[in-house]
Amino acid sequence: MKVLLIGSGGREHALAWKIAQSPRLTKLYAAPGNPGIAEEAAIVDLHTENHEDVVDFCRTHAIDFVVVGPEAPLVAGLGDVLRAADIPTFGPSAAAAQLEGSKGFTKDLCARYGIPTGAYRRFTDAEPAKAYIREEGAPIVIKADGLAAGKGVTVAMSLDEAFAAVDECFAGAFGAAGAEVVVEAYLDGEEASFFCLCDGKSVLPLASAQDHKRVGDGDTGPNTGGMGAYSPAPVMTAEMVERTMKEIIEPTVRGMAESGYPFTGVFFAGLMITEKGPELIEYNVRFGDPECQVLMMRLESDLLPLLYAAATGTLEGMKAEWRDEAALTVVMASRGYPGAYEKDTPIAALPDASAATKVFHAGTAMKGGGLVAAGGRVLNVTATGKTVGEAKDAAYAAVRDVSWENGFYRNDIGWRAVARETA
């Protein structure tokens, strides 16, 4: 099978690494890729925002299957264009991608289908939003409705912080994504991510993970796209997984189909495990980044036929086998991230990969014959172990072998799980 992978981040490097292991693969292409992905795939100079160029490439190179990694091309309708050209594609339609592309769309779906989530209101003007916030009080959550690269959410602990977040959205900080704001109740509990594949009708549960959104140790500082993750998340017990499937995932699949937007691809449910049980914070319509990296390290099964089954309506009866171990990834980022940061700083050395350790490339590039940091989140140093604590020790040992003066990272990825393991 000839496969084209769309994307250039750490998530796509993890997908490329796993797809490249498939005995069904004959050739893997990637666009735009990165130096890490180049170790697994042929990098293609393809402007993926020009959908017809992607179709032309697929026809010219007899591509059998396209895997779309990031959310933006999905929301822009790349999957629709490819499917219209009879090219099987992993990822939802633009209409179904509204689950991630519009927070308001998802909250309305939850309300219609009784899916547990925080109470909310939608606003297109600052003053009514602020009036509602005054009524509800803090803490409260302010979300830009559209895609904001993981940075459009403010958990406001005071009214002033909430008002500032509303003003930031409506002042254009997130462009069109902030033209509408969702204000929702603050949920108290422990966050977890849960992943499933869906072919429009059937659902295959994958695994859980826990992300670390805040930039600083102790979950301090501003939100980021994610500074680390581990899998599985201990809070996602067998009972919690069963409840998540019955109360959240299955009603969503039914609701999307009944609304005329059958969902194919990966469901990434951002959950808060509260005293009441699992509640939905948000949906994403692609693998998480950096959660994908820990999932791929743990996945025993061949990924390619699972993705193809989700894309072609043949998921029923499929199974995913998982290694009975934990995986943890530490994100190394450019100093200053998530604010302004210096680009093209040299990365002098990376640790050697082993069976238990892998460095996935995110914002990297080759310049002057050397590896440089070209983005905010740059490397995902990932390891496995019998426990989260063991995986954490292995990952941080590898982090110390990275020679990159301009990089920084959190020192406490996995702290909740390690505390549970050592209690």
Curated annotation (Swiss-Prot):
Cofactor dependence: Mg(2+); Mn(2+)
E.C. number(s) listed in UniProt: 6.3.4.13
Binding site for Mg(2+): E282, N284
GO molecular function: ATP binding; metal ion binding; phosphoribosylamine-glycine ligase activity
Textual note on the cofactor: Binds 1 Mg(2+) or Mn(2+) ion per subunit.
SUPFAM superfamilies (alphabetical): Glutathione synthetase ATP-binding domain-like (SSF56059), PreATP-grasp domain (SSF52440), Rudiment single hybrid motif (SSF51246)
Keyword DNA-binding tagged: no
Source domain of life: Bacteria
InterPro entries: ATP-grasp, ATP_grasp_subdomain_1, PreATP-grasp_dom_sf, PRibGlycinamid_synth_ATP-grasp, PRibGlycinamide_synth, PRibGlycinamide_synth_C-dom, PRibGlycinamide_synth_C_sf, PRibGlycinamide_synth_CS
Entry similarity comment: Belongs to the GARS family.
Name this protein carries in UniProt: Phosphoribosylamine--glycine ligase
Encoding gene (name): purD
